């Protein structure tokens, strides 16, 4: 739960997704893994956090270098050539170290970022969203932090990016949760961050221990559909908080 400076309460995007997910596949996996399930989940969480931290460090370091270079030349915007220089410079610096369980995943994200990123508009940005005409005595909407808003070399416009790690290829159900997560973040940006000018689409980059990542794209209209999907899940989640509460406009 997140409370903003005015006292409004927002529930976590990831918690809402968990509470409204179809957990049959997860329960089957837990039954199959037995006592190892908890350990495997903990390892996966740790490696994901560390791999995320590494790519976040790359982007923030590149931003500092690019902004400093642009300011020193009196430029209002960062040219793509300057960003390319800054990103390469960031890769020559020493990033946070990764342990053996996460080094392959971190390298996978590093390589994708270096190959595709042409600029950034935001990194680890917190969003909140209150659906139109929504009222509830229990919460005011949802909140979360998206990984990055990036300009990409091979696609026009600004893209909402989410980093994931996985030892195995993800099934359709879990991918659907990832897409709905992007939809939730998209809604918050549209509501509170008009300077980002809307997204051309979204992309989920799932790092693997070895080899290239699994990359899944959502075009602009598909991202809007996923925003609607998450809004419906949020309404279902709120109804579960109290069956008798009012959710007008949902």
Give the residues covered by each predicted segment.
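Mg2+/Mn2+-dependent nuclease catalytic core
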Residues: 124-247
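Metal-dependent nuclease catalytic cores that hydrolyze phosphodiester bonds in DNA/RNA
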Residues: 1-143
């Amino acid at each position: 739960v997140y409370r903003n400076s005015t006292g409004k309460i927002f529930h976590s995007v990831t918690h809402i997704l968990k509470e409204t997910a179809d957990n049959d596949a997860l329960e089957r996996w837990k039954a199959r893994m037995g006592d190892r399930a908890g350990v495997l989940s903990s390892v996966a969480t740790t490696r994901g956090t560390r791999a995320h931290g590494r790519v976040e460090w790359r982007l923030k370091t590149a931003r500092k270098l690019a902004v400093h270079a642009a300011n020193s030349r009196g430029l209002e915007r960062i040219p793509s050539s300057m960003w390319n220089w800054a990103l390469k410079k960031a890769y020559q610096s020493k990033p946070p170290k990764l342990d053996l369980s996460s080094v392959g995943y971190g390298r996978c994200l590093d390589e994708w970022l270096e190959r595709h990123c042409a600029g950034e508009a935001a990194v680890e940005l917190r969003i909140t969203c209150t659906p139109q005409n929504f009222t509830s005595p229990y919460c005011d909407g949802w909140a979360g932090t998206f990984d990055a808003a990036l300009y990409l070399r091979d696609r026009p416009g600004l893209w909402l990016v989410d980093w994931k790690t996985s030892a195995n290829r993800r099934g359709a159900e879990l991918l659907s949760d990832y897409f709905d997560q992007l939809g939730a973040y998209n809604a918050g940006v549209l509501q509170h961050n008009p300077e980002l000018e809307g997204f051309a689409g979204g992309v989920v980059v799932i790092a693997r221990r070895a080899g290239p990542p699994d990359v899944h794209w959502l075009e602009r209209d598909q991202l809007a559909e996923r925003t609607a999907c998450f809004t419906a899940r949020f309404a279902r989640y709120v109804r579960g908080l109290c069956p008798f509460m009012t959710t007008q406009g949902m």
